[in-house]
Each structure stands twice: as C-alpha cells, then as structure tokens.
A protein has these predicted regions:
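Detector for small/aliphatic-rich hydrophobic stretches
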Residues: 3-7, 16-164
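Non-catalytic, conformational "gating/processing" segments within enzyme and secreted inhibitor domains
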Residues: 66, 109-270, 275-277
C-alpha cells in the first residue's frame, strides 16, 4: 500500500448547476435541516474548512497565469482521507498534518465523513448533492481486506485491483460517465506505465436560488480585470437582504439556495474603481 501512496493519481470533479430540469422531487420546498455535530465532529469540520482555504491558496499559486480555474477542496480531502486509512509511519504523520487531523483517530475521521456524506443530501429539497469515490489499483499491489472494507463502509468507495490496460481505461471512463450523469464521459485515454493507482472523487451539486435572478434584469456592466483592463460583461442583478462582510482586504456576500441551509459565498478584493453595491 505504501508504494501505491507514492504513485497515486488523484482526480476530482466538482459539477455545479443552478437550473431546474430534473424530475422527481427536486425543487420541492422542504424545512431547513441543520446537521447536528458532536464536539469532535465540529472540530474536524473546522479543520476541513481550514484545509479548503489552504488548498486553494496553494493551487492559486500554480494557476495564477490562467484566466480561470475551478477546484474542489472537499474532493481532495475525501481522496486523501481514503489514503489515510492505508498510511502509516512518516507518511501518515505528514498527511495528518496537511489535513489538520492531528489529534483525531481514523475512526473519528471516518465517522465524520460517513455522517457528512449521509446528511448533506438531506439538507434542502431545492438542491441535489451527490458524492462518489473510487480507488483503482494496478494488479500486483494487493490491498488489505481491512483497507477495502473501511473505505467501502465510510466513504462508500468502489475499490478494486485492475490490469491497468485498455479494459481499465474503459471501466474508469464508464464510472466517470455514470457518476457525472454523462457530463464527463471520458477522463483518461491511456494509463502511464508507472501509474499504480487512481483515486477519483466526483461531486455533483445542483441548486435553485432562494431568491432567483430574473433574466430580464441582466444588463451589460463594466468589469475591471486584475491586469487593469476593462471589459463589458452580462451581469445578473437583484435587490435582496443577504449576509455581507467587508474589510480592507476582502468583500464577501452570501447567496442562499432553497431553504437557506446551503449558500454560495462570493468574495472579491475591493478596489477604488468598483465595489459590490449594497443597499
């Protein structure tokens, strides 16, 4: 398992949608439901949030020349959490430190993950949240039954040894196609000779705004680029009372979905040219 850890290739998907084209009960109003957290679970949750911002900052350093990028820190923490169940020694210590999980047992971490994966989809009938995990390992690197059972039980992960030939490429792509509702039909076209394992997480979120934007209110507005340039872009607008925070370094506004249990927080660095218009 240690060799696998050193050669793991990690894929994460975060698919977002704010439209209503699903059947079933999606879009049905439901009372707000908040996840009850024990003291330990609350502490772990705080560390997951800390890791999310740390992870974003590190990725932003390497992607700073790109116009846009999208990451899912939750996906990364789930994949690393699965690996943590098979790590020991210095590898385990360093992973715990990176994730902020020092002082917590694997059992406490696993129970937190299991609870969140079970409870998050229940929060709001006007949102859909699905999460899928899988671990694919090359034949010749047998996995301990306890490791497989743990990740199946707490992460609901599909774990298997594979020949890592074209048939494995097809299996992985088929899994991705299924778990992303056909939005990502293919993620790899070959497997490198030195690849030993693939850890894949797919998170899908679909939500309806609590206060929906009217298409008729969208207007072209001036947008100031970080480079100093100016462009005109279609800009959604509405007048609502929402949670808002600002200081010298950042402005943050929270836009709730459905019953308010989930929300999207937008942040922006304030400039002398343009600030979020708050009334």
């Amino acid at each position: 398992m240690k060799t696998t850890l050193l050669s793991a290739i990690l894929f994460t998907f975060c698919l977002l949608s704010c439209t209503n084209d699903d059947g079933g009960d999606f879009g049905k109003d439901t009372p707000r439901y908040d996840i009850p957290l024990s003291t330990k679970s609350g502490e772990i949750n705080t560390q997951v949030q800390r890791f999310s911002f740390d992870f974003y900052r590190e990725i932003a350093k390497t992607e700073k020349d790109k116009e846009n990028f999208c990451i899912s820190p939750l996906s990364a923490s789930l994949c690393l959490g699965m690996i943590l169940n098979g790590a020991d020694g210095n590898t385990y210590t360093e992973m715990q430190k990176t994730l902020g999980f020092e002082g917590f047992t694997n059992q406490q971490i696993n129970e937190y993950v299991q609870m969140m994966q079970t409870e998050l989809p229940k929060l709001d009938g006007r949102t859909i949240f699905t999460n899928a995990n899988s671990l694919w390992v090359r034949n010749g690197f047998p996995l301990l039954p306890e490791f497989i059972q743990t990740n199946q039980t707490y992460y609901n992960a599909e774990v298997s040894n594979e020949p890592f030939d074209n048939s494995t490429v097809e299996k992985i792509n088929s899994w991705c196609n299924q778990k992303t509702n056909g939005l990502i039909p293919e993620i790899i076209n070959n497997i490198p000779d030195k690849a030993v394992s693939y850890l894949i997480n797919a998170i899908y979120f679909k939500g309806l705004w609590k206060n929906e934007f009217k298409e008729s209110d969208t207007k072209d507005e001036t947008f100031y680029l970080a480079s100093g340039g100016i462009v005109r872009v279609p800009t959604m607008r509405q007048t609502q009372s929402n949670n808002y925070y600002a200081d010298e370094d950042v402005q943050v506004i929270e836009l709730p979905y459905g019953n308010g249990a989930l929300a999207w927080s937008f942040s922006s660095q304030p400039t002398v040219r343009k600030k979020i218009s708050i009334k």
